[in-house]
Amino acid sequence: MVRATISADIVSSTALKVEELTFLQSEIRRFLESLSEKSQGKNWGRLFKGDSVEIFLHDPHEAFRTALLLKTLVKKTFSWGKETNAKRELFRKYGIRLAIGVGEMRTVDKKQDVLDGEAIYYSGRLLENQLKSDKGRTSMKRTMLFGCNDESLSEQIDTMLGLLDVVLKKATSIQSEIVYNKLLGKQENEIAKLLNIKQPTVNRHSNSAGWNAIESAVKYFEKLNFES
């Protein structure tokens, strides 16, 4: 059966203060726990080496939304302004770099934290190559990537993620939080109450963050046939 994995790495994690990284790690762990609970254990993930994340998704159609949830979760965590420190500015803009892999899996062992197969090969290799490409750079071309055994589909989805990468790079903390909650399925009036702001403000930030494009991309991905 076709499954999906997400391999991810916090951008410029060494530039974060100890208390900032600790808080971010706790937010990511909470997100991973929620992911597992909502799927009754079918989906799961782990945070390792302090700044790396791996996620297994039983249903590959959930990968795009989950990746964007992880992206906006990290981006919404700290409400910084523009940073003079180059590495902290990279974190503010990008938050986390990630790669989605879709394919057959040979081994999925939650207890031993072991993943082996096509999906993790694609996501892991893409992320590793991007890390090498980004090393020493003060700017990044890509922080969201996609791979599967269908070259045409890979190119199509990868292009879509590249465009959303540009959109989300510009998103502020509050805009990222609104997109995050919309990805969870919450309505604007619910988000307004949650954030203690007015509904028109939610709508304005949502439009500024490119929500319509994000939603369209997610819905398109969720309709794909990965078994053919």
Regions found by a protein language model. Name each.
Residues 1-228:
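Regulatory and interdomain segments flanking nucleotide-handling catalytic cores
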